[in-house]
């Protein structure tokens, strides 16, 4: 949800103007995550000596768009933008309000005191902040914001002020602080007491570090440094030694930091580091990144990056690899489209091909999902499949449940992650649990993953983000390869998740003779799918015309059944998300159990009727709607002459195999939602109150 970006240049001279441009551009790359205010923190002096400037931190914060922050930056009269810094750390943040309304005081960076001794940017929610705040207030600390994050900044200062020895490291302070935090967080700290140093950490919220240098790096694998003795701080530290200032540095030794345990350029010291919530903010600067794990503390001191952990646990990986991103900058740019959402809708012919590339062999009718290959026999022996997700990803599970049940002959449950957790759903060792998330960081889905792992189930991730928490923590998985999706309303990720689950179903039954004809039928449908999607997209003008007739309405009902119930749910969600119209996806079989009361001549109704096993029942529902003076728009098969003849308004889509038809029927609804939002004057990519990556529960 919130966006974190920080930039540290070490012996790479940069003017303050260049530093600010880098920070602002980083925030712009994170805008798609959703936000309501933004801010930056940087060295504030105007001396020629960077160390003198680092003794003062300047904060600039603004409600609204990043563009408004950029304008505010250039209004600052006391900042010389042409001052050059040989070493500098700047931190920046886009805030999504969770505690306190959107305003400059509540925006990040949050500060420890009026002198800005410590500042911090934060993505997540601290659940015990009220207890921490109460303690700090009892010690005389005054709070100016309503945020949970300010508690973190003041907690660092409290630790620093009460540390008896003067040689405490920034890393040690942060380690002590995160021991007291409950909830989810990704944090980056800056301090006047530790000029040119950056410390970042995460727990339950993503954080990565990009590295850029003209010179060879010392290693491609950074070893983890562990504390050599147990800390004396307890689970609650008020009243402990830390409070009394007696917790000396010697009570908790730190593994040695030297040339064998750090990342740095070998030949020269010049290096740049980029801390970010996700890769889209760093890809234009570097493709070499380190993904932090929960409770990692990453520190840059004297241009050297080291990674620390407080304690060693079973299964810990001994280091963090420097990975190479395959993403390219042009993939996250709009190109000739007016919005990212429009671009992503029209990318679907290519994105479904990318999802299938190298996995589906149309010559010998085989499917090979490399990420599942080593576990497929175990999955085939399971007692049931559980698909766990939120929002659009949940709808992808609903859309493919029927074909999964048909081809695997296993019971398939599709669960909303939040409800799954609320019910303490029974999970067994012979269950296989799928976790579907575009970002791979969805908080409820991630909590569901950990819940299922504790109970011994095999876990499978289906994500669009390499290195995400879900992709790392699952036993195996499928990367959907849809490419970066920036628009908050998911489009191409939905169709790629759909195709990925169908491919999994095909892989599960490849050795069943009774299924071979059905497998071939579905695989031929997959082969034709990109061309059929292009055909649907060619109807854009027709759908735009329909939008001009509907955009002034306050509500719309979308009805269907069978394979298309999920299409109704997903279409209704898209309309809700970006047009702010009330919309409801209705199972046509439930029409007489309540929803029919809503139908009259004024209520816009969209029905999905395809030539599959539910055709006759859908026709019956259509007649019931018409009998109540409803005037439905019907999305139907272009070869369905009966429906076309008997219905005043139709959207005719090409025919495909029944279990893939939902991909072709959802695209008109994606286009309709887009055009409705544009006609109603709303920002399609950044709908109000919503975020792309929901990293808090």
Swiss-Prot record:
Domain named Glutamine amidotransferase type-2: residues: 2-303
Sites of Phosphoserine modification: 259
Residues the entry annotates as binding substrate: 392-393, 437-439, 442, 593
Induction: Expression in the liver oscillates in an ultradian manner (with a 12 hour period/cycle).
Domain SIS: 375-514, 546-687
InterPro entries the UniProt entry points to: GATase_2_dom, GFAT, GFAT_N, GlmS/AgaS_SIS, GlmS/FrlB_SIS, Ntn_hydrolases_N, SIS_dom, SIS_dom_sf
Enzyme superclass (EC): transferase
UniProt keyword annotations, A-Z: Aminotransferase, Biological rhythms, Glutamine amidotransferase, Phosphoprotein, Repeat, Transferase
GO MF annotation list: carbohydrate derivative binding; glutamine-fructose-6-phosphate transaminase (isomerizing) activity
Superkingdom per UniProt: Eukaryota
Reactions the enzyme catalyzes: D-fructose 6-phosphate + L-glutamine = D-glucosamine 6-phosphate + L-glutamate
GO biological process: circadian regulation of gene expression; fructose 6-phosphate metabolic process; UDP-N-acetylglucosamine biosynthetic process
Function: Controls the flux of glucose into the hexosamine pathway. Most likely involved in regulating the availability of precursors for N- and O-linked glycosylation of proteins. Regulates the circadian expression of clock genes BMAL1 and CRY1. Has a role in fine tuning the metabolic fluctuations of cytosolic UDP-GlcNAc and its effects on hyaluronan synthesis that occur during tissue remodeling.
Protein name, UniProt field: Glutamine--fructose-6-phosphate aminotransferase [isomerizing] 1
Phylogenetic lineage: Eukaryota, Metazoa, Chordata, Craniata, Vertebrata
Gene expressing this chain: Gfpt1
């Amino acid at each position: 949800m919130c966006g974190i970006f920080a930039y540290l240049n070490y012996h790479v001279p940069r003017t303050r103007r260049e530093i600010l441009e880098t920070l602002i551009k980083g925030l712009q790359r994170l805008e798609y995550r959703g936000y309501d205010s933004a801010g930056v923190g940087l060295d504030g002096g105007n001396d020629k000596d960077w160390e003198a400037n680092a003794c003062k931190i300047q904060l600039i914060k603004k409600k609204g768009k990043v563009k408004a922050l950029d304008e505010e930056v250039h209004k600052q009269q006391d900042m010389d933008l042409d001052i050059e810094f040989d070493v500098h750390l700047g931190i920046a943040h886009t805030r999504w309000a969770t505690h306190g309304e959107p305003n400059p005081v509540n925006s990040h960076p949050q500060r420890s005191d009026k002198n800005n001794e410590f500042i911090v940017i934060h993505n997540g929610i601290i659940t015990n902040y009220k207890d921490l705040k109460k303690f700090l207030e009892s010690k005389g600390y005054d709070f100016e914001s309503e945020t949970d994050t300010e508690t973190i900044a003041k907690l660092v200062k409290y630790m620093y002020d009460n540390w008896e020895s003067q040689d405490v490291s920034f890393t040690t302070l942060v380690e002590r602080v995160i021991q007291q935090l409950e909830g989810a967080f990704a944090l980056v700290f800056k301090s006047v007491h530790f000029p040119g140093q950056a410390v970042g950490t995460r727990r339950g919220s993503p954080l990565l570090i990009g590295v850029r240098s003209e010179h060879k790096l010392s290693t491609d694998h950074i070893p983890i440094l562990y504390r050599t003795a147990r800390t004396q701080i307890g689970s609650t530290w008020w009243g402990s030694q830390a409070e009394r200032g007696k917790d000396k540095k010697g009570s908790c030794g730190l593994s040695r930091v030297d040339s064998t345990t750090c990342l740095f350029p070998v030949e020269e010291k010049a290096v740049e580091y980029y801390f970010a919530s996700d890769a889209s903010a760093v890809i234009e600067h570097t493709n070499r990144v380190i993904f932090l794990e929960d409770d990692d503390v990453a520190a840059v001191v004297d241009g050297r990056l080291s990674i620390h952990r407080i304690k060693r646990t079973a299964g810990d990986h001994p280091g963090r690899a420097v990975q190479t991103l395959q993403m390219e900058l042009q993939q996250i740019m709009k190109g000739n489209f007016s919005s990212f959402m429009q671009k992503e809708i029209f990318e679907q012919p290519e994105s479904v091909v990318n999802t299938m590339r190298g996995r589906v062999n149309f010559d010998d009718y085989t499917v090979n999902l490399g990420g599942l290959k080593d576990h497929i026999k175990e999955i085939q022996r399971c007692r049931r499949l559980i698909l766990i997700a939120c929002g659009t990803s949940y709808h992808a599970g609903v859309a493919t449940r029927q074909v999964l049940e048909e081809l695997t002959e296993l019971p398939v449950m599709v669960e909303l992650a939040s409800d799954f957790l609320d019910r303490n759903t029974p999970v067994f060792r012979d269950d296989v649990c799928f976790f579907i998330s575009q970002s791979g960081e969805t908080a409820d889905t991630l909590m569901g993953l950990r819940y299922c792992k504790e109970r011994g189930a095999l876990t499978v991730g289906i994500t669009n983000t390499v290195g995400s928490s879900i992709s790392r923590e699952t036993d195996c998985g499928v990367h959907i390869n849809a490419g970066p999706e920036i628009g908050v309303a998911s489009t191409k990720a939905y169709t790629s998740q759909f195709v990925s689950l169908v491919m999994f179903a095909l892989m599960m039954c490849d050795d069943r003779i009774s299924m071979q004809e059905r497998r071939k039928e579905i695989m031929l449908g997959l082969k034709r799918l990109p061309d059929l999607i292009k055909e649907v997209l060619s109807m854009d003008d027709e759908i735009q015309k329909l939008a001009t007739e509907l955009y002034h309405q306050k509500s719309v009902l979308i009805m269907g059944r069978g394979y298309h119930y999920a299409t109704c749910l997903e279409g209704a969600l898209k309309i809700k998300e970006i047009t702010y119209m009330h919309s409801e996806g209705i199972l046509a079989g439930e029409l007489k159990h309540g929803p029919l009361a809503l139908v009259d001549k004024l209520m816009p109704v969209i029905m999905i009727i395809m030539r599959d096993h539910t055709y006759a029942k859908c026709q019956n529902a259509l007649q019931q709607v018409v009998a109540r003076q409803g005037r439905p728009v019907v999305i139907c098969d272009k070869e369905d002459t009966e429906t076309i003849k008997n219905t005043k308004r139709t959207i005719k889509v090409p025919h495909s195999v029944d279990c893939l038809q939902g991909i072709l029927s959802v695209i008109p609804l994606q286009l309709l939602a887009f055009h409705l939002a544009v006609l109603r004057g709303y920002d399609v990519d950044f709908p109000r109150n919503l975020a792309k990556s929901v990293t808090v529960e």
